[in-house]
């Protein structure tokens, strides 16, 4: 199929539910300088800090050094921000932060706002979508996924997954001639379950009424050269044109390709050595795994993976946020440095994030588990944008 945009034209992109900017990372790899982030929506502070570290290396050259503590607190208190990705921070929250941490956060939020972060997705309708070529929206999966409580995504439901309809609200507030040419959605496979069928069909029909043609597929990151078997639903919606999503045909990498060659002592799970392992068995997804006998009543919590094969889906929480790997006679965990590589970021990205000392291991793995395979995004962006 012919490519539908000329790469010499800058692709103007808005990242809704931006996370750590997997879309931006893919754009950087595919289009080099031929793209522009014209705005984003993200309210989870650790993700914003990591986004700015990865894409702008902001913490090595703080732009706002001489701002008083009172001014920083006043600024942050007037933004809709979250520290847990679920709820806004409480009154007085920023006053409890130490000066060094507060300064890093303040700089990250200021720079993010400078790049067009609206923070609260519910404000997207107030911002014109004019002069945006590509709007990406990987809306929250918590109310859809098997890991979550499956409240669904009905319009007006008040669920986090129901924030999808803020995209509809923004499109409705935009003149038809000013609509973005491309809309790119990503979410978990449960989006296609019968429980969510009615809402997904409503959404597709809404887009069709605006002139979009939809291509929707389940794509596996392993088919695009990732070390991870990560199946996610993608939909590309194009104004007055059909663009087919790419079919992955690359050989997956093994888990060991993203693992540090020297294993840190803190990553070795000595407490598991007392458990015997079942025989390793290979799945259809090229995952080779065994189980710790008697370790947990939850099967996935006891899985141990062979590093010579493809790995499982990394999740933000639950058993698959704690991936266990056989390492000779030991069992080790996948650490946060490795999860950045596992989702398709570069080694320098994890190093930059590690330079910010207040970010925890759990927060780093959480954002990677919530992110999108950069390898899949590269293939999609190459097809629609070049």
Curated annotation (Swiss-Prot):
Record InterPro entries: C5-MTase (IPR050750), C5_DNA_meth_AS (IPR018117), C5_MeTfrase (IPR001525), SAM-dependent_MTases_sf (IPR029063)
Reactions performed catalytically: a 2'-deoxycytidine in DNA + S-adenosyl-L-methionine = a 5-methyl-2'-deoxycytidine in DNA + S-adenosyl-L-homocysteine + H(+)
PROSITE patterns associated with the record: C5_MTASE_1, C5_MTASE_2, SAM_MT_C5
Domain of life per record: Bacteria
Documented EC number(s): 2.1.1.37
Gene Ontology terms: biological process: DNA restriction-modification system; methylation
Keywords, ordered alphabetically: DNA-binding, Methyltransferase, Restriction system, S-adenosyl-L-methionine, Transferase
Any one Gene Ontology molecular-function term assigned to this protein's record: DNA (cytosine-5-)-methyltransferase activity
Domain SAM-dependent MTase C5-type residue range list: 11-386
Positions of the catalytic residues: 141
This protein's record includes keyword Hydrolase: no
Pfam families: DNA_methylase
Enzyme class per UniProt: transferase
UniProt family annotation: Belongs to the class I-like SAM-binding methyltransferase superfamily. C5-methyltransferase family.
Purpose of the protein: This de novo methylase acts completely and exclusively on CG residues in DNA; methylates unmethylated and hemi-methylated DNA.
Official protein name in the record: Orphan methyltransferase M.SssI
Taxonomic lineage of the native organism: Bacteria, Bacillati, Mycoplasmatota, Mollicutes, Entomoplasmatales
């Amino acid at each position: 199929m012919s490519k539908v945009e000329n790469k010499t034209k800058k692709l103007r992109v808005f990242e809704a539910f931006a996370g750590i900017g997997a879309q931006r990372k893919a754009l950087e790899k595919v289009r080099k300088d031929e793209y522009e982030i014209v705005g984003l929506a993200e309210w989870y502070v650790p993700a914003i800090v990591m986004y700015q570290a990865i894409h702008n290396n902001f913490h090595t050259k703080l732009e706002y050094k001489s701002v008083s503590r009172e001014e920083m607190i006043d600024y942050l208190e007037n933004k809709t921000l979250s520290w847990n990705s679920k709820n806004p921070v409480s009154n007085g929250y920023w006053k409890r932060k130490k000066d060094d941490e507060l300064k890093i956060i303040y700089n990250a939020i200021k720079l993010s706002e400078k790049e067009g972060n609206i923070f609260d997705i519910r404000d997207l309708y107030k911002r014109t979508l004019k002069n945006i070529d590509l709007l990406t929206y990987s809306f929250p999966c918590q109310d859809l996924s098997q890991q979550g409580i499956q409240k669904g995504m009905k319009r007006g439901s008040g669920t986090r997954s129901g924030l999808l309809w803020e995209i509809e609200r923004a499109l409705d507030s935009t003149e038809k001639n000013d609509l973005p040419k491309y809309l790119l959605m990503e979410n978990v496979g449960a989006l296609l379950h019968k429980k969510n069928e009615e809402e997904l069909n409503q959404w597709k029909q809404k887009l069709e009424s605006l002139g979009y043609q939809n291509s929707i597929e389940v794509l596996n990151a392993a088919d695009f050269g990732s070390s991870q078997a990560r199946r996610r639903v993608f939909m590309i919606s194009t104004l007055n044109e059909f663009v087919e999503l790419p079919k992955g045909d690359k050989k997956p990498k093994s888990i060991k390709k993203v693992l540090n060659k020297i294993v840190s002592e803190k990553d070795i799970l000595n407490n598991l050595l007392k458990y015997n392992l079942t025989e390793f068995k290979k799945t259809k997804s090229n995952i080779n795994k065994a189980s710790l006998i008697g370790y947990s009543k939850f099967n996935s919590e006891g899985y141990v993976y062979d590093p010579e094969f493809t790995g499982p889906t990394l999740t933000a929480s639950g058993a698959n946020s704690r991936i266990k790997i056989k390492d000779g006679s030991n069992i080790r965990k996948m650490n946060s440095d490795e999860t950045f590589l596992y989702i398709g970021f570069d080694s320098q990205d994890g190093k930059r994030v590690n330079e910010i000392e207040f970010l925890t291991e759990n927060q780093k793995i959480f954002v990677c588990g919530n992110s999108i395979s950069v390898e899949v995004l590269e293939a999609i962006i190459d097809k629609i944008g070049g």
